[in-house]
Structures are given as C-alpha cells and as structure tokens.
C-alpha cells in the first residue's frame, strides 16, 4: 500500500544520505569531457588527432555501489513530496492533450518531468498491475533513466525524452492503435520512447566517426548513437531488476523489440522505413492483428514522436527549434576550434534557425507525417499537419527579415540532403 511504499523509499533515502556517499552518473558526460578538452587547448598550441580521440572518449569510471544507483536525496524527496500535487497533478490529468506543455511540467516537477510523466503513464495504462511491477523498482528505474540524460545538452536531454514519451502516448490513443495494441506493445513503446536518446553525448554520428570515437568503432559506424541508446537502456533494465520476475525468454524478447524501436529513430534510415510503410499503405495490406505489422506501425509512431516538434503549437515548437539549433552550433564551435571541419547545419556564421527549420520540415518531417496521416486520418493528424504549415509560414516570415536569406535557403537544400544521410542528431 502507499504507507509501505513510502517507508521503503524513505529507507532508500536514508541509506543514500550516509556520509561519504557520492552521487554517481553512468555513461558519457560531454560537459566534463569537453571542459577537459578546452582546458588542454589553453596549454597546448595545437591538439593532435590522437589527443582529440583520447580526450573525447566520454568514458567515466563508476565509484559507488551498483545497488544504490538512481537517486539523490533531494531528488527522491522531490519525487515523494512534489511531483503529484498541485498544478503538476492537474497537468497530468491532461497528458493526452496535444498542447501539453512539457516545459511548464518540467518546472512544476522541479526537473523530474520524465520520471513523473512516465510513471503516470505506466499507471494510466494499467501496466503496473498487468505486469506485477514493483513500484519501488519502477521508480528507481525511471530515475536512473532520467539521470542518464545530460542536462547540459540544450536539446537531447530528459525533457526531450519526456516530450517524446508524451507524444507516443497520444499516438497510442489513436483509434487504430488503441483498438489493436496489447499491454506488451504499450510497455515496449513507452520504455523505448523514454530511453530512445539515453546517454546522448550532444554531438552527432559524423562527429563521433571523424574523431575515431570508441562508440563509432564498436558499432562499425552504423547507427552509432541509436545502438548506444539501446544498449544503455538494456543495461538499466537489467540493473534495475524491474522485470526479473519474467521468464528469461520474455526479457530477451523485450530487449530485442525495444532495440528495434530505438534503431528506427536513426534519421539516416528514414527513407528505408518510410518506403516500407508507404508500400503497405499503397497495397492496403497493413493488418494490425499481425504482430510484425503492428511493430512496424509502432516504429513509425516513435519516429513521428521523435521529430514532432514542428507539429506542436508555435510557442512550444519555437523553443524546441532554438534548442536543437543551439546544440548543432555548439558542435560546430568545437569543430571550428579544433579544425575538424564543420558539419552541415552546424556553422552559426552561415546558418540560421529559420533556414534549418524550413529545410527540416520540407525534406524530412512533412513526408513522414503525410504518410502517418494516411494511416491514421484523425483530428490529431490534421492538427499536427496544420501546425507544421503554420510554423513553416512563421519561419519563412522570419527568414525574409534576415539578410541574404535566399542564399542561405539555397545552401540548405544541399545540406538537407546530407541531413537524411548523416547529420540529424538522432
């Protein structure tokens, strides 16, 4: 009951509050690595390619007990005392509304939007009861996920993950999916949405490849980030023990299907998935009682959720556009500083938010959401396409106010073609 849950979590807090216990963080931490990288350059006039590879390893060693991973004292108390009261609780009652303001919700939950929202969705969909989940293990699992996102990233952080998870929930509510998905499908979809950018370093795949990063070597330059997100998610699933009561075969199947969902978010493979999806729609042979077809639709839903920012209202969409562009430009600044060759769309001197967004909507987003609307011709689909049109018009208005905007737009047409192959921060 609630009293027992409180006592168990309070016990965790007391253990973590012992003197000498250091909050740990798994995986890469670009802010620290780049800070070391920058400090080194102050001493050395030039940095060799070998030093670049060494300093951008992103590896950190763990010093604390594996058992106590997942929550600091203050964060746990926030979860207990603040997440589900007042305005935050009122917002969760409208979590299926497409105008859900994830930025406001993140402020109301004191930076715990991913934990609060995902836990609520697990409860809303009846997953806790259906799969007999331990609520304390679930909390710990979600906190570990949230902590493995880098808050220093302007875009690829826990708030983005929460936004994608909320969008995925909206798609799961669409009539065609709601009438066909199983609790298993919902479980995998929500976990994949919450972890789809787990431990994102804030740079894109070409950056990792040209610096000979160990992840690029490990995954042979193929879906490097997506493979890392998936493997990181599997690590947390196993570490949390959330599904330890399920048969081993079921756990392996879960890990594989979550991987297939996350790997589908690789933007360089968009044409592959989009062509397959379009082919099924053209033939009219998409049968949602077939598990394989249903899984393809869930892959497309996650792809849509991942890049749905231009489908939100202008106030929300503009904030996301500014954040993702700042992350692009931050990478470009690093590439300039160390003479690595600036990646397409990452040069703040030649690119603009308006040009990047117009190109992204034209070449990547509109084709995807047009096909999704063919599959699910609902009010939500029309709302999303309507927002895309309005937001695109707004960016074009801002573009006309910029000097040399026509030249920049022409340059973007080439860059956007490169984007489909390598550059969107998947």
From Swiss-Prot:
It is found in: Cytoplasm, Cytosol. GO terms for biological process: cAMP catabolic process; cAMP-mediated signaling. This is High affinity 3',5'-cyclic-AMP phosphodiesterase 7A. Interacts with CBFA2T3. Its cofactor is a divalent metal cation. It comes from Rattus norvegicus. Binds 2 divalent metal cations per subunit. Site 1 may preferentially bind zinc ions, while site 2 has a preference for magnesium and/or manganese ions. GO terms for cellular component: cytosol. The keyword Cell membrane does not apply. Pathway: Purine metabolism; 3',5'-cyclic AMP degradation; AMP from 3',5'-cyclic AMP: step 1/1. Composed of a C-terminal catalytic domain containing two putative divalent metal sites and an N-terminal regulatory domain.
